[in-house]
Curated annotation (Swiss-Prot):
The keyword Lipid metabolism applies. It catalyses: glucuronate acceptor + UDP-alpha-D-glucuronate = acceptor beta-D-glucuronoside + UDP + H(+); 17beta-estradiol + UDP-alpha-D-glucuronate = 17beta-estradiol 3-O-(beta-D-glucuronate) + UDP + H(+); 17beta-estradiol + UDP-alpha-D-glucuronate = 17beta-estradiol 17-O-(beta-D-glucuronate) + UDP + H(+); 17alpha-estradiol + UDP-alpha-D-glucuronate = 17alpha-estradiol 3-O-(beta-D-glucuronate) + UDP + H(+). It comes from Homo sapiens (Human). Changing residue 93 to V/L/I: Loss of estrone and 16alpha-hydroxyestrone glucuronosyltransferase activity. Pfam families: UDPGT. This is UDP-glucuronosyltransferase 1A10. Keywords: Endoplasmic reticulum, Glycoprotein, Glycosyltransferase, Lipid metabolism, Membrane, Signal, Transferase, Transmembrane, Transmembrane helix. Residues 1-25 form the signal peptide. Glycans are attached at residues 71, 292, 344. Its main location: endoplasmic reticulum. The gene is UGT1A10. GO terms for molecular function: enzyme binding; enzyme inhibitor activity; glucuronosyltransferase activity; protein heterodimerization activity; protein homodimerization activity; protein kinase C binding. GO terms for biological process: flavone metabolic process; lipid metabolic process; liver development; negative regulation of fatty acid metabolic process; toxin catabolic process; xenobiotic catabolic process; xenobiotic metabolic process. The chain crosses the membrane at residues 488-504.
Amino acid sequence: MARAGWTSPVPLCVCLLLTCGFAEAGKLLVVPMDGSHWFTMQSVVEKLILRGHEVVVVMPEVSWQLERSLNCTVKTYSTSYTLEDQNREFMVFAHAQWKAQAQSIFSLLMSSSSGFLDLFFSHCRSLFNDRKLVEYLKESSFDAVFLDPFDTCGLIVAKYFSLPSVVFTRGIFCHHLEEGAQCPAPLSYVPNDLLGFSDAMTFKERVWNHIVHLEDHLFCQYLFRNALEIASEILQTPVTAYDLYSHTSIWLLRTDFVLDYPKPVMPNMIFIGGINCHQGKPLPMEFEAYINASGEHGIVVFSLGSMVSEIPEKKAMAIADALGKIPQTVLWRYTGTRPSNLANNTILVKWLPQNDLLGHPMTRAFITHAGSHGVYESICNGVPMVMMPLFGDQMDNAKRMETKGAGVTLNVLEMTSEDLENALKAVINDKSYKENIMRLSSLHKDRPVEPLDLAVFWVEFVMRHKGAPHLRPAAHDLTWYQYHSLDVIGFLLAVVLTVAFITFKCCAYGYRKCLGKKGRVKKAHKSKTH
């Protein structure tokens, strides 16, 4: 009987704990960004749903990757463009990357990307034109907004409905992250993301880093002009990028210092790099068969991401030629035209389980565009890389991994078949690359809390407390001259100059007095002698 009396309250306690968990449940509005950005954001949303929160996802009817089968409320709105329009504009942008890579905001502005960005930003106007949806959002009494800041619509929604926001991002162009969080970023050792410099810059690189920083301030307003015009129209007041980004409660940054260079951070910046890494699952039979057939040489995984569907024919043939000269089996995720010189060791697939393949012990190398998702999966699984960055932060990611000895970077526009062949043989045969990536993997995994759990905690924190004002620095309330202490410097300089002036005047007066008295004595002495 005593034993029964001891165990009987256990189910009741469990029920009470579960009840408490759901009593804490809140209401979250999610404004995601289309494309690969949604993949990892979705994992956070799904975990929040499992924890009992009421989640509402707002997305345009026209999208590539946005998932409508989530176990939550999904609200869609029509757009002024079709999926064909979106695909056409993106293909223009993607093809341009095979001709010239943007290494500054000005070059990005002058490229064909501006048309795609204008179309991309325009969907926010469509959201607010849907008065029924806006009224629903207004009456829903959300606790917070969970958003991707590259799509400024989430920031506009947060400001329009006066809701605390949790931002989910790898980084943002134009120093909007640093300015929005009021986080110092010394140009002497914090390189611009588009330049691909390390934190140990030469004098020439530091000069160029300053020039590009000034260029950002001059031209970023034009790159995001359409987005800011839409924001001003919706909010019915002139809006700057700082106005949108500066009200962020928590920044969930998909980075980690095994990839990022050490730099200043703010208390509302939470690092969740590697959130997309998962425990490897058993491979589909098709891929298991490829690996078994590869023998002792193993495999190489090749993917340039979900957004690159085709490569110019000449470049694709050069790549195929290089792949045919290594003994490994190459699994190439590619949906474009099959290169005519494709070797027997190279298998084209429309899709591959990238993380699961990278986690297989027979995987020898990873050919990647150095997107943050692929780079972190490579770090988590300890696979050295050959990196062929195309746009955005990819050049920066590649430089960081190369600096840490975890891979080789190739200029995809200039590389030859021989360059790719040599790079592959280097990362496969030189043990230092494997040792370096394994060291980074060990550092990355040595953490007290998993990135997904950390992200979920901070979203819930903002929901519970209606923001995180205690983490907001007073720098937001200062003018530019107060922030840089120019008024204090001016005051102290004025004091020093005043003291120096008074001291000089006193010395001059004393000197004149002494000299004048001495002169009168001499004159009196001369008159007596005469």
